[in-house]
Amino acid sequence: GNTVQAELQKAATRLFCTACGITGCSRTDSGVHALEYAAVLEEHGTSVIPEEAVPRAMNTYLPQDISVFRSETVPDDFSIRRHVVGKEYLYLIWNGEHRNPFYTDRALFYPRELDMEKISAALPHFLGTHDFRAFMASGSEIAETTRTITDIRAEREGDFVRMFVSADGFLYNMVRIIVGTLLEVSEGRLSAADLPSVIAGGKRESAGRTAPPEGLYLHRVFLRR
């Protein structure tokens, strides 16, 4: 399928009538959503479009499921990846008895009971700076696996459960594996007390399953100003 980057590139090329480069703030897996995403557009022509008009102009060329809502001019040597100091992900769970057709591919349908007390007891173990190797998809070739989680929380509102994780950076599938692990804590397959040794052990098989992509949203991007 088409990527968001490819669609942005196509729209920018049509808008500015010249080939444009797009660099995103991070990679997202297929099936994952973004409520906020930052990207740098390199426009090589001599644009006469004022920056505040770019979002509306871009949106006329973008498909219905992508929307630009803000733009600003940055220096030529601006590197988006170097300016990202953190990100927050949201994982959305529909915990109703029956599936919600409005949230097909937009939330994980989980009809079993979710034990919010058990989940809440598990959350503090993830906070702080740890080697999160156990929460990285096997086969990833990343040497440095230490990350700092600055905030992690779970909230219920009716049949929706929202899990938020903020960190200075994330490993491949890290949030989805954390969510899968929290589901297994709720199910009683793991306990909150197991988590320090799971984290310290660094073995992927000790952590929980990888939750499906459809519930995951890149929620906020924190940029150094």
Could you describe each region identified by the protein language model?
Residues 1-225:
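Structured-RNA-binding interfaces characteristic of tRNA pseudouridine synthases
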